Amino acid sequence: MKRREFIGLGAAAMLPGMLVAREGRAKVPLMRDTKRFAIHDGPGVRTTFFVKGCPLKCVWCHNPESIKSEAQWARFQHLCQHHATCTMDEATCPTRALKLYGKPWTIDALVKKALEDKPFYDRTGGGVTLSGGEPLKFWEWAYDFFAACRAAGLHTCLDTSLYAPPLAIEKMLPVTDMWLPDYKAEDDALHARHTGVSNKIIKKNLERLVAAKVKLEVRMLIVPGCTDGADIRARHDYLRSIGIADKDVVELEYFDYARSKYLALGMKDTMPEKKEPVRL
């Protein structure tokens, strides 16, 4: 049996008893959400599990609840009726104004959940996708999870920024059937300004995936005023230069639908304005 240590999340989580587990030396993430019948997270019909915690601070982040590793309550004021007897209970809130982001799942429970839809995966070439946050922040746990998925006959996809130590990439290669890396900006200064981190390690990791001849689909989010203009062409040029075919690159349109989440979480809204991107 693996030794288990527990670390409290602190008062900010506002949920007594909510814990983050460590199995051996592997950090175990909380799950911010699960999505069944996902059709944009890899091939076929999939179940996507979203971990909580990300080392990047993208100004356009459309899932701000995924940045912190700790559990967070969100109160959607436009739904809240401010009941005097409010118990801060997501399950009993009559207007669904309360939502808890960050719940503990065991690997066995996640695999069991995914297997509920295995007939759909088998018919469509689908499977399980691990997204975030940033799954590689918890790469030891992610390895164990994907190994369990593979043992259960489930196809695995990893949705990642690739901002992780090279060791994480090497360890995940044998258990990951397909990679879905984001490539946010080609210019390093631009990348650092809008995400809080350099893209140098990301590029090295991406080149490692190409060298390993993995199946991948690179996602390029086009954010007006941030990563449009010359950076679109620069990203395409770089990806071609390292051997990634155009058919394996997808441009994603930017939306600012997440503004209500920032308000509900008590976070500063940093999302750029939604407008037409510049293309040179």
Each predicted region: which residue ranges?
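Conserved AdoMet/S-adenosylmethionine-binding subsite of the radical SAM
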Residues: 108-264
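Cysteine-centered iron-sulfur cluster-binding motifs in ferredoxin-type domains/subunits
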Residues: 46-61, 73-96, 102, 134
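Auxiliary Fe-S-binding modules of radical SAM enzymes
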Residues: 6-17, 24-41, 210, 222-280
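Glycine/small-residue-rich loop that forms an oxyanion/phosphate-binding "nest" at active or ligand-binding sites
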Residues: 90-96, 102, 106, 113-121
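Short, charged low-complexity linear segments at domain edges
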Residues: 25-45, 55-73, 253
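Phosphate-coordinating loops and pocket residues in cytosolic domains that bind phosphorylated ligands
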Residues: 8, 82, 193-196
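Residue-level marker of structural boundaries
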Residues: 12-15, 67, 119, 178
